[in-house]
């Protein structure tokens, strides 16, 4: 894929889920209009549970009011999951038409990015046939849920949402749900496997490098992005 245009990237720190969602939608419109390059957003969220487009409340192990974090229905694919501190979130805003990628090829590349990132921490991870995400044995270490949309009045097919990689996140949050709707599999993290967790921002740097390699892009930092409510903690 040599010759692809550069991809912008930004580390945003900790951002409320609703604010990050609004930012993605704005950037996706700008990308589809040709006003912005492909962009990789890297961040953490405060504790929040999210579901995909279909109702996944049957995968709650506790009543919603006992979760201890908000529950948000989104427009991505996939089932219920948790996001919180100690988890690296990556939201690529990419025009798949210009990249000449199908949706499943795109997802497979995201898995490859995660697997390569984990090798930086001496973790050998892989995929399980028929399931999305990245696994270490029978335990999921990274979830993927994406949306490919065509913003109104534009010709592009632009991605939003993305991946969540468990670095040092408190795995107790996952015990309150059937994570990703898969009852017979567990979850793990870099901390669980290595005994210690690197800073999430360090993992973000490693993932950015691997993203550039897998997608054949030069990665260019963005100094600032306007975030609604400006709730980022850097």
Predicted regions: what they are:
Residues 28-32, 148, 211:
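Generic secondary-structure transition motif, activating predominantly at the C-termini of alpha-helices
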Residues 53-61, 70, 144-167, 171:
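Short, conserved beta-strand/beta-arch hydrophobic-aromatic motifs that form part
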Residues 152-154, 164, 169-234:
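C-terminal accessory segment of soluble enzyme catalytic cores
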Residues 90-92, 132, 144, 163-167, ...:
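A structural signal for short, well-ordered beta-strand segments
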Residues 1-141, 172, 176, 197-198, ...:
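N-terminal lobe of the biotin/lipoate ligase/transferase fold
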Residues 87, 160, 185-187:
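Short, solvent-exposed beta-strand edge segments and adjacent coil->beta transition regions
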């Amino acid at each position: 894929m040599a010759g692809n245009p550069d991809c912008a990237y930004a580390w945003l720190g900790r951002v409320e889920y609703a604010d990050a969602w609004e930012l993605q939608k704005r950037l996706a419109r700008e990308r589809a209009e040709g006003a912005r390059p492909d962009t990789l957003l890297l961040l953490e969220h405060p504790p929040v549970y999210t579901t995909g487009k279909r109702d996944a409340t049957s995968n709650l192990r506790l009543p919603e009011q006992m979760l201890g974090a908000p529950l948000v229905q989104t427009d991505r694919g996939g089932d219920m999951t948790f996001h919180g501190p100690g988890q690296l979130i990556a939201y690529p805003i990419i025009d798949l038409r210009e990249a000449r990628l199908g949706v499943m090829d795109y997802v497979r590349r995201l898995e490859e990015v995660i697997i390569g990132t984990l090798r930086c921490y001496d973790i050998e991870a892989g995929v399980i046939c028929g399931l999305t995400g990245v696994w270490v044995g029978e335990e999921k270490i990274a979830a993927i849920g994406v949306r490919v949309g065509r913003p109104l009045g534009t010709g592009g097919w632009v991605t939003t949402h993305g991946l969540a990689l468990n670095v040092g996140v408190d795995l107790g949050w996952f015990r309150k749900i059937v994570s990703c709707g898969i009852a017979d599999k567990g979850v793990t993290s870099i901390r669980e496997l290595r005994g210690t967790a690197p800073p999430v921002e360090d993992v973000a740097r490693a993932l950015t490098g691997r993203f550039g390699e897998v997608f054949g892009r030069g990665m260019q930092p963005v100094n600032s992005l306007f975030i609604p409510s400006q709730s980022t903690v850097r």
